Regions:
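N-terminal secretory signal peptides and thylakoid transit peptides that target proteins
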Residues: 1-17
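C-terminal motif of bacterial Sec signal peptides marking the signal peptidase cleavage site
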Residues: 20-21
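Ser/Thr/Gly/Pro-rich low-complexity, disordered linker/stalk segments of secreted
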Residues: 24-53
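Boundary/entry segment of secreted carbohydrate-active catalytic domains
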Residues: 52-90, 94, 101
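Acidic-and-aromatic substrate-binding clefts and catalytic sites of carbohydrate-active enzymes
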Residues: 76-86, 107-119, 194-196, 238-248, ...
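Substrate-binding cleft and catalytic face of glycoside hydrolase catalytic domains
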Residues: 97-111, 120-232, 237-239, 307
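Aromatic-rich peripheral "rim/lid" segments of glycoside hydrolase catalytic domains that contact
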Residues: 179, 193-209, 222, 280-287, ...
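Glycoside hydrolase catalytic-domain groove-lining segments
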Residues: 213-218, 227-231, 246-250, 254-317, ...
C-alpha cells in the first residue's frame, strides 16, 4: 500500500507514538488444539534480533502440520527468495501455500496489450508444484500495478473508450486465469478498492474514475468464466479498523447484491505491536462469515514500530529499535501475534493464513514507511523461530 494510504488509515485508527511495552508472562489469547510440537526442550537460540533463551529450533513444529485442522499456512515470496537457503528451508518445512509477492501482478506479466511475460510466475509455480505447495494468485487488478496500456486511447467518446478499457481488463483477467488454471487455488481478483477517507466509500483510482464500481464486477465475472472452480477474493487492508471496515462492507454488500461471484475476503493484516485488539480482528472475520463467505489472512506481519500517523508523511517516526528497546518490542510483538492467531483458530471460516514474507532478513518494512531495520515475521534473520513463533504454537509458552 502507498505511504499516504497507510498514514491516513493509522491516523484514523489512532496510532500511538510509542513502541508498545508489555508486562511479563505469556499473556494474550492462546488456543488449545492444533498440531504437535513441544516447547519443553530449551536452548539458547542464536538470533539476529534477540538474545533471549528460546526453545531449541529443532523442536519447532511444522506450522502446516500444527494448524492442519484449522487452515493452510502460507508465506509471500518470489522466485529469487524461495531459492535462498534460509527461506527455502522454512518454506519446505512450514508452508502448504505460497503467494507470489510481486510476479503475478499485472505490471510484470502484462508487458503490453496481449503480450505477456509469465516466466517468473511460472518459475514460482514450478517450485511450488515440485514441493506439493499450493499457490494463491495475487493480484489480477490493483490500481498501483496496472500498466499504462490498459488506459491508452481517445477519451473523446467515453462510451467507446470505456468499452475499449473494459475489453482489455476482461481479456487480461481471462488470459492470466487460463494460464494458471488448475495451478492456483485462489485469486485476489481486486486489491485495495476501499477508500481510506471516511468521506468516500471507494478508492478514487483510475479504474473507479472510469467505471465506478463496475470494474470490480468485470474482473470477477471474467475470472469466474475462465475458471469456475477457483476461489475468488476481494483483498483489503484495514478491515480490522471499524471505520474502514464499514466502508468495505458496503462495497462487499453491493457485490453480493449484484451477484458478483466472490468466494471470500482477504484481510491483509499489516498490523503493529499496539493495534489492533483481538476484538477488532474478530469483528472483521465475523462480518464476513455473516455474509456466507470465507476468510483468508493474506499479508500478515507485525511491525515493531507503533508509529504516530505523522510518520507516514515522514515526521515523528520512531528510531530503529536496538538493545533493550528491541527486546521490549519483540516481547510485545510475540503477544500481538498470539492474539489474532487465537481468533483465527476460533473461526472455522478462516481457511488460509499467510505472512507477507518468510524471515526477517527480507521484509518490505525495512524501507516502509522509513528506512530502518524491522523484524515483523515469525522467523529471525538466521531463519530461527522467534518468540512470536512459539507464542502462536504453544499457549503455555511464557514470552520472555
Amino acid at each position: 500500500m502507498s505511504n499516504v494510504n497507510r498514514r491516513n488509515l493509522l491516523v484514523a485508527a489512532g496510532a500511538s507514538s510509542l513502541v508498545a511495552a508489555c508486562g511479563g508472562g505469556g499473556g494474550g489469547g492462546g488456543y488449545s488444539g492444533g498440531g504437535g510440537g513441544s516447547s519443553s526442550s530449551s536452548s539458547s537460540s542464536s538470533s539476529s534480533s534477540s538474545s533471549v533463551t528460546l526453545p531449541d529450533p529443532s523442536t519447532a513444529p511444522a506450522l502446516k502440520n500444527h494448524f492442519a485442522a484449522n487452515f493452510k499456512i502460507g508465506m509471500a515470496v518470489d522466485p529469487g527468495i524461495a531459492s535462498e537457503a534460509i527461506a527455502n528451508a522454512i518454506l519446505l518445512k512450514h508452508v502448504n501455500s505460497i503467494t507470489a509477492e510481486s510476479v503475478m501482478k499485472a505490471n510484470p506479466i502484462g508487458v503490453s496489450e496481449g503480450v505477456y511475460d509469465f516466466s517468473q510466475a511460472d518459475t514460482l509455480v514450478a517450485f511450488a508444484q515440485a514441493n506439493s505447495i499450493e499457490i494463491r494468485g495475487h493480484a489480477l487488478n490493483w490500481y498501483q500495478t496496472s500498466p499504462a496500456w490498459f488506459f491508452a486511447g481517445d477519451q473523446t467518446d467515453m462510451t467507446a473508450y470505456k468499452a475499449l478499457v473494459r475489453g482489455r481488463l476482461e481479456t487480461y483477467v481471462t488470459d492470466v486465469v487460463n494460464h494458471f488454471k488448475g495451478k492456483v487455488y485462489a485469486w485476489d481478483v481486486v486489491n485495495e478498492v476501499t477508500s481510506d477517507d471516511g468521506s468516500a466509500t471507494y478508492r478514487n483510482s483510475q479504474w473507479y474514475q472510469i467505471f465506478g464500481p463496475d470494474f470490480i464486477d468485470y474482473a470477477f465475472n471474467a475470472a469466474h468464466a475462465a475458471d469456475p472452480t477457483v476461489s475468488l477474493f476481494i483483498n483489503e487492508y484495514g478491515t480490522e479498523e471499524a471505520g474502514k471496515r464499514g466502508r468495505f462492507l458496503t462495497i462487499l454488500d453491493g457485490m453480493i447484491a449484484r451477484g458478483v461471484p466472490v468466494s471470500g475476503v482477504g484481510h491483509q493484516m499489516h498490523i503493529n505491536t499496539g493495534f489492533p485488539a483481538a476484538s477488532d480482528v474478530d469483528a472483521a472475520l465475523t462480518a464476513v462469515e455473516a455474509r456466507g463467505l470465507i476468510n483468508h489472512i493474506t499479508e500478515m506481519d507485525v511491525s515493531l514500530y507503533n508509529d504516530p500517523g505523522s510518520c507516514y508523511s515522514g515526521t515523528g517516526c520512531l528510531p530503529e529499535a536496538t538493545g533493550a528497546t528491541l527486546a521490549t518490542a519483540l516481547h510485545a510483538q510475540a503477544l500481538k501475534y498470539r492474539e489474532p492467531y487465537a481468533v483465527y483458530v476460533a473461526h472455522a471460516s478462516v481457511k488460509s493464513v499467510t505472512t507477507w514474507g518468510v524471515a526477517d532478513n527480507h521484509t518490505w518494512l525495512d524501507s516502509f514507511p522509513v528506512v530502518r531495520k524491522n523484524h515483523p515475521l515469525l522467523f529471525d534473520e538466521a531463519g530461527n523461530p522467534k518468540s512470536a513463533f512459539w507464542a502462536i504454537v504453544d499457549p503455555t509458552f511464557v514470552v520472555p
